[in-house]
From Swiss-Prot:
Binding site for ATP: G169, D170, R171, Q172, T173, G174, K175, T176
Species whose genome carries this gene: Clostridium botulinum (strain Alaska E43 / Type E3)
Family: Belongs to the ATPase alpha/beta chains family.
Listed NCBIfam families: atpA, PRK13343.1
Main location: membrane
Full protein name: ATP synthase subunit alpha
Amino acid sequence: MNIKPEEITSIIKKEIEKYEKQIKTVDSGTIIQVGDGVSRVYGLDDCMEGELLEFPNDVYGMALNLEQDNVGCVLLGNEEGIKEGDIVKGSGKIVEVPVGEALIGRVVNSLGEELDGKGPINTNQTRPIEVKAPSIIDRSSVNEPLQTGIKAIDSMIPIGKGQRELIIGDRQTGKTALVIDTILNQKGKDVICIYVAIGQKQSTVAHIVNTLTEMGAMDYSIIVSSTAADSAPLQYLAPYAGCSIGEYFMNQGKDVLIVYDDLSKHAVAYRTMSLLLRRPPGREAYPGDVFYIHSRLLERAAKLSEENGGGSLTALPIIETLAGDITAYIPTNVISITDGQIFLESDLFNSGQRPAVNAGISVSRVGGNAQIKAMKQVTGTLRLELAQYRELAAFAQFGSDLDKDSKKRLEKGKRLVEILKQDQYKPLEVEKQVIILYTAVNDFLSDIKVEDIKKFEKELLEYVDTHYRELGRQIAEEKVLTDEIKAKLEVAIVEFKKIFLQEA
């Protein structure tokens, strides 16, 4: 049997082609200490700050401290089963979260994993949780209103799309209720809402999910939840994950509203991590860069220019104060980062004024440019009149005799305060707010008893809706109170008032 050399050569070549040896180099290290959700790893010579690390048992970690002879990491999962001597591998990338339309209506954790039992999230797109904020050139000014549906806010402290408005107040003053109402008010307005729960009770988050589902708001909402049961690193990552999910929609030219509830607990989670990593503590034991963790998060809220799609990300961070002290470290930090704040006060809340907005020290630095003209026309003097009322009310407590003009102002102030009260889960369309506030500011309520104002408001809106339906539509479309609209509105108010007073 003759075997030709060519045949042997071809057989050898085929065999060599089959044999592929790939060498894969992985940056790795050894755990030298683990506990309290923190680990120190020896090795990882090419590790980067914020890099995603692979621990045993399918647990991931994040490198935060790059020291001379070891790397300080935080674990993004359960540390059970991880021990000294285990191998840790570097991934060469930072933490990413899944993004896309598939997340709408879902409840996810800080890593974008589902928590609602509705099955896996079908998306193959991911986005890093740390992204550089849009530059000045990429932005446009805030010029479109984001209606909250709350009279006290849309009239005096208007919020624009792309703004960062802080909601600050003690515990149990209605901060979360206020943002939930704002989310409910976005129904049908083509705004995607993201609610980030940081360090809250699981029962609270479940209640919010149920409320949004019942009201039909989960159709355009996403909830990112990192509850008190989660480790500090997961609580720390939650707002950045929520922000990345929101930025995906913003870059597509959509409007997004994101709520961080709340950044006080976020700062506490970061302080916990930093102290466990042996970083030097500063004021109130917070690390020196606690300002930076919030500023880099909130700077990502923006109104993009038309060339970049014109999308927006509006941020409503929440801060919880202790005994109304807004001069503490974290409150002052976040006040200085945001474009204004809505201050909720316990005293107002307990006296029955809800939402308990203190109009005196609440401010919106950029929202005024976004407010519709009709609302500006109506509420030009509202803040001043409320301030004068408070001053007079304090003066009247001493039992001093007031002149006729002061008494008139006092009575009007009482009615203005009453008209700004609003029930929870009942946001109002902006045209209805304009009608009600026009009635109050222009002294149409002077002969209505204070206790009848709520009833008057409800029935007036029903009357206008039945007999003057085109009036609300005109205000909504033209966004300005022309002389013709004012005349029609005054006729409607006078007609209804006559009926109301006869019934009373």
